Structure formats: C-alpha cells, structure tokens
Amino acid sequence: MSIKSDKWIRRMAEQHGMIEPFEPGQIRQQDGRKIISYGTSSYGYDIRCAREFKVFTNIHSTVVDPKNFDEKSFVDFEGDYCIIPPNSFALARTVEYFRIPRDVLTVCLGKSTYARCGIIVNVTPFEPEWEGYVTLEFSNTTPLPAKIYAGEGCAQVLFFQGDEECAVSYKDRNGKYQGQHGVTLPKA
C-alpha cells in the first residue's frame, strides 16, 4: 500500500471526479486576506469546512449514547465561522464531495493550525467506494470558546492505494453513511 502524490490526486479528481469541487493548487489567500490553506498538497488534499454546523449542547441530555443519539443534543447553525463552547464540540461537513476508488483507503488528519490552538479535527477513514460529503468533528479541548472557519482548510486527506482491489467495498456492503449529504449524526 503506497501513499499517492499530488499528480495522482489531480488526475483522479480531474478525470474521475474523485473530489468535487477540486482545487489543483494550494490556496493560502482569499480576497487579499490570509486563510487556513486548502487544496492539493504534495501527498494529500486539504479539505474545507462548509457553512453548516451542529454545535453540541447538554441542555436536553444527560448521557451521550451513540446507539440512541438524541438530535436535540445539537443546535443547528449556519455562518462563515462557528464558536465552539469550552470543552465541547461541533459537527460540520466538507465543501468537497468525495468518490473513493475501490482500491483506495484514506486517512484524514487535522491541520496543525487548529491543533496548535487546542482544536482537534477528527474524521474516520474514507473506505473503498465510499462517496459523499465528509462529516467533520471539531473538539475544543480548551477552557475558552474556540473559533473555526467555513470555507477554509481544516484537515488533510491522505490517499493510500492497495496492492489489489478489496473483495467487499463500503458500497458493496451498503454502508450506512454512503452518499451522505448534510452533517450526518451517528447511526447505530
């Protein structure tokens, strides 16, 4: 299994629609102002956070149960940025829609700009033949409110190509998050 380069990422995005919308370079400024970078890097792709957020609140719940998750545990918010309460988290989705090839698995890591501020970005791997918008989780590990920005980079996706195609892909087994479009809550 080998990590894939910027050339491979560009080819797969442009010829096979693996990432839409796709940025072939690295964007560091927008309208003359510095932003958290996004787009193609040497061996990965820096994804952006969209304007849709679900901010966790403990007003209605006493226990967080992944098998029986209460949608009232979140407050929906839309904007150019989101403030995450201290020691809490928010969900968002990517601007980009992904179509992962059958012989590829991705690993997604948070950007150091956020990590250095105590904001951890968590995303599970994108499995072979998974497609959809990625649901992102931002954890504020600090005792202060934390700000995250829509339309700017938040995490980097690394693409690994297997030596052969898998016998059963995410699509083959009808994975529960296949084709997700908005910020998707846990499904047991």
From Swiss-Prot:
Catalytic residues, chain numbering: E137
EC number assigned by the record: 3.5.4.13
Transmembrane segment boundaries: none
Keyword Hydrolase among record annotations: yes
GO molecular function: dCTP deaminase activity; nucleotide binding
Cross-referenced Gene3D superfamilies: 2.70.40.10
InterPro entries: dCTP_deaminase, dUTPase-like_sf, dUTPase_trimeric
Pathways per UniProt: Pyrimidine metabolism; dUMP biosynthesis; dUMP from dCTP (dUTP route): step 1/2
Subunit-level organization: Homotrimer.
Catalysed reactions, as listed in the record: dCTP + H2O + H(+) = dUTP + NH4(+)
HAMAP family: dCTP_deaminase (MF_00146)
Listed name of the protein: dCTP deaminase
Nucleotide-binding is among the record's keywords: yes
Keywords: Hydrolase, Nucleotide metabolism, Nucleotide-binding
UniProt binding sites for dCTP: K111, S112, T113, Y114, A115, R116, T135, L136, E137, Q156, Y170, Q180
EC top class named in words: hydrolase
Membership in a protein family: Belongs to the dCTP deaminase family.
SUPFAM superfamilies: dUTPase-like
Physiological role: Catalyzes the deamination of dCTP to dUTP.
Single biological process term from Gene Ontology: dUMP biosynthetic process
Stored CDD domains: trimeric_dUTPase
Any Pfam family the entry gives: DCD
